[in-house]
Amino acid sequence: MTKHARFFLLPSFILISAALIAGCNDKGEEKAHVGEPQVTVHIVKTAPLEVKTELPGRTNAYRIAEVRPQVSGIVLNRNFTEGSDVQAGQSLYQIDPATYQANYDSAKGELAKSEAAAAIAHLTVKRYVPLVGTKYISQQEYDQAIADARQADAAVIAAKATVESARINLAYTKVTAPISGRIGKSTVTEGALVTNGQTTELATVQQLDPIYVDVTQSSNDFMRLKQSVEQGNLHKENATSNVELVMENGQTYPLKGTLQFSDVTVDESTGSITLRAVFPNPQHTLLPGMFVRARIDEGVQPDAILIPQQGVSRTPRGDATVLIVNDKSQVEARPVVASQAIGDKWLISEGLKSGDQVIVSGLQKARPGEQVKATTDTPADTASK
């Protein structure tokens, strides 16, 4: 080989070697890029949110009245249909009034006697007035006549009270509905002996329109919501909260109710308090004892944060955590407070801010401290709002 040929081959060899080295470096960088786990992130944004709390509960009658006899006797008639609607004052049972009618008539007779005796006593006093101080009537006799007249007046008052008592007992033989509502089954039939003060009710009347819904809420949640309102994190337009109702069959009750009050004590065994709502029930769709779920309007949270539920995991202690992608495309674990599930999302009250990137897919490939390649689950313009 000539000297010129050797000089020609040397630069070519150098160029080829450089090209091979550059190619290897490019493949290494490509492999490094390809090796980054790919994850999907949800970009956190804040927005006003109507906060509703869904709680289990049961329906209760607005008013309940147990019908009991106030006098003793034999039931002659039952004057209602079981399961029907009755009006206050409507006759339900008729107890044999014979004895009570006789007592009433006797009391009226005694009253007449007392009134007659009182009339004579007062007439005697009038006759004695011009004779007082003469030899015909002494002062003592006059004083005695006045005392007799007063005793006669007292006897009239007592007789009138006896008549009124007898009249009331006679009226009690007609057992009436104390309230308007729906009456249940009767525990007695015609011919049964009932007694004044018996422990067993004759029937029960329940007012169903409106109707109560009693729900329970943990004392912790109750205090948290109360503090949110006091601190301004939760805005309420008025003191009354609207309530929606979901019935046992999953259907939403068409009429809305209002929250009336919360109990003043906490149940020591369950750590919960009772909330009571009232609902209109004109068609008697709701019956006492039904299991329902009440959705209570707690107010509006102006800067609420919602993230998909799959982005939240729990530690063995039950604490909520999320994985986020920071500005360096590195994964970070962050503790959060997931206060409430709303649909398929968690309401986050602490731990996140607007603009954070929460990993919602590819969690099994993401490790804290590692770099990842992130794609968003929402358009950029939506996430930036």
Curated annotation (Swiss-Prot):
It holds the Pfam family CusB_dom_1. A lipid is attached at residue 24 (S-diacylglycerol cysteine). One of its GO terms (molecular function) is transmembrane transporter activity. Residues 366-385 are annotated as: Disordered. Residues 373-385 have a biased composition (Polar residues). It is found in: Cell inner membrane. GO terms for biological process: response to antibiotic; response to xenobiotic stimulus; xenobiotic detoxification by transmembrane export across the cell outer membrane. The keyword Iron-sulfur does not apply. GO terms for cellular component: efflux pump complex; periplasmic side of plasma membrane; plasma membrane. It is a lipid-anchor. PROSITE patterns: PROKAR_LIPOPROTEIN (PS51257). Induction: Induced by LeuO, part of the acrEF operon. A lipid is attached at residue 24 (N-palmitoyl cysteine). Residues 1-23 form the signal peptide. Keywords: Cell inner membrane, Cell membrane, Lipoprotein, Membrane, Palmitate, Signal, Transport. Its main location: membrane. The keyword Electron transport does not apply. Part of the tripartite efflux system AcrEF-TolC, which is composed of an inner membrane transporter, AcrF, a periplasmic membrane fusion protein, AcrE, and an outer membrane component, TolC. The complex forms a large protein conduit and can translocate molecules across both the inner and outer membranes. Belongs to the membrane fusion protein (MFP) (TC 8.A.1) family. Part of the tripartite efflux system AcrEF-TolC. Involved in the efflux of indole and organic solvents. This is Multidrug export protein AcrE.
